[in-house]
């Protein structure tokens, strides 16, 4: 069976950003911390009934929303409860997402003392003008201060989230953001292009974005700068110093399993290969999530929140994840993780190799430089 991770979703934010299509809700009248932790542990207990064998969790990721809005006491109770229900690897990577507006020194020292060993800080830009347009509640100065607080609290594994292709952003401004991030010496940088997603304010009222050519040029210049400073790209939008790739995200991209608990969380669990891989989905509304009741374990597999992945869908699901990684996948991994013969990747695989979109080297398949820019085209071939 593949490695397994745990994703925990915290759906509350100080305010909803206009570009955000994640399941996040502005805090209106306080956060029901105690009830939510109870619900998370109940949810986890229930999901464990789907496992066909004991599994050891190699990473935990607390995402949102803004998980750092929760108190250290609430997260302590949550992590203690998880420790009683799950076996965690000795070097388990435990990540907490945090936004610069929520940083207090004492609070983050306590988070570190709980065993949280990686922080992911949602900075997005170091330019106050762009932060304002993005609806962020922090300033550039607060972003820099947050990184300082994190380092002083003992966090030596730190990701900074940044975006490019922002409304009216110039190439020089995008480069400036990357230079500011590098100067803070994080171990990992996530660098995403802003996209206008359905069901967001920006989608309804689109801001003026730079031309595609300008976005592409800015991206290439920033990538070069990251490489020069020791940040090696290992996924479409992820750059890490040696030894600091995100174990949790790598597990997603390598078609690993993950338990997903919390409002709107998704999971993937391999019960047996190739015919018994399931996806789980939880109610998106925090109110509904807090009220939900759980069927007995025997009914769990047929409940509406659990869906089997059809075998014919496995090739595209596998390719969709693995081809985001610079080193792609081996045909042996494909067989091991899906239970299917590499022949099931045809005819798409041969077509992509012939068109120079994919490269095959010693039984490894990965995107060519050209394919990297046409990932959507590659995936369409696997879908057909």
Give, region by region, the residue ranges found by the protein language model.
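C-terminal scaffold of the Radical SAM
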Residues: 3-5, 24-50, 56-340
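Short amphipathic alpha-helical interaction segments
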Residues: 339-351
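Local cysteine-cluster metal-coordination motifs and their immediate loop/turn environment
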Residues: 11-24
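Short, amphipathic alpha-helical interaction segments positioned at domain boundaries
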Residues: 370-384
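Minor-groove-contacting beta-hairpin "wing" of winged helix-turn-helix DNA-binding domains
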Residues: 364-368
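Short active-site neighborhood of thiol/selenol oxidoreductases, capturing the structured segment around
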Residues: 6-10
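A short, conserved structural fragment
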Residues: 353-363
